[in-house]
Amino acid sequence: MKKTALAMLATLLCAGAVHAQTASNAAAPASRLDEVIARGTLRACTTGDYKPYSFYKSDGQFEGIDIDMAESLAHSLGVKAEFVKTSWPNLMNDFVAKCDIGIGGVSTTLERQKRAFFTDAYMVDGKTPIVRCDDVNKFQTVEQIDQPSTRVIVNPGGTNEKFARQFFPHASLTVYPDNVTVFKQILAGKADVMVTDASETLLQQKLNPGLCSVHPDKPFQFGEKAWLLPRGDMVFQQYVNQWLHLARATGEYQAIQDKWLK
């Protein structure tokens, strides 16, 4: 009798466990990974104004380091990459509402982390000045820049503007709407300095002879570049991180970076 009762109890416990597992699986939300594969497209939000990571050309196409990498990620999933143009002030809202990933030289910040996951960082960066080459010695430090006579220029809505407002309260600050042509303002003598990511200053000094990056190897602060991912979706995050790990380990990422920076 005892054996029969124990057997029945064991059967009931097993059945309950199976039912609980089935219910748990049914209740588990689908990962964005599955949605992307089912949809057949990977939607990437990007500003298109930040060389060498993302640039929106006159023909309506995007190019840059992050664009090539997003194409690679999409290929690994067997889908097509679809790029959604946004702006730095609207990046987070557009990403949450419209996209699977957010790319294009995005700096990791705790404020952004509140609304999204980040991938593993793929580049260490930091804020440093770019100025006319004759002025390199004049703008070496935050204190030298933060003077009423200094004309600082920044693009709106991102970490550059936040940095400038925090560290240059005494300087004359101009928020210039076009992050592509903003460097021409310095060349033309309409501004003295822009503080942006060191990687961008290195490229822009090549594109704009007469401009020089100031100590890009010793930026004012520590920064990293990573991609935005949907908050809470660890399955998708793990896939993208593994893809990124392999892209770096195999040299694919380095080859793409060299294509745009060398």
Say what each PLM segment does.
Residues 21-27, 159-176, 213-217, 244-262:
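Ligand-binding clefts/hinges and TM-proximal coupling segments of bilobed small-molecule sensing domains
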Residues 22-106, 114:
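Extracytoplasmic small-molecule ligand-binding "clamshell" domains
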Residues 54-58, 70-79, 141-146, 160-177, ...:
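Ligand-binding cleft/hinge of the Venus flytrap
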Residues 67, 82-93, 137-139, 174-188, ...:
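Short helix-initiation/N-cap motifs at beta->coil->alpha
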Residues 73, 94-96, 145, 186-187, ...:
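Hydrophobic residues within well-ordered alpha-helices
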Residues 89-93, 106-115, 163-166, 187-221:
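A ligand-binding cleft/hinge motif common to bilobed small-molecule-binding domains
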Residues 133-150:
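Flexible hinge/capping segments at coil-to-helix
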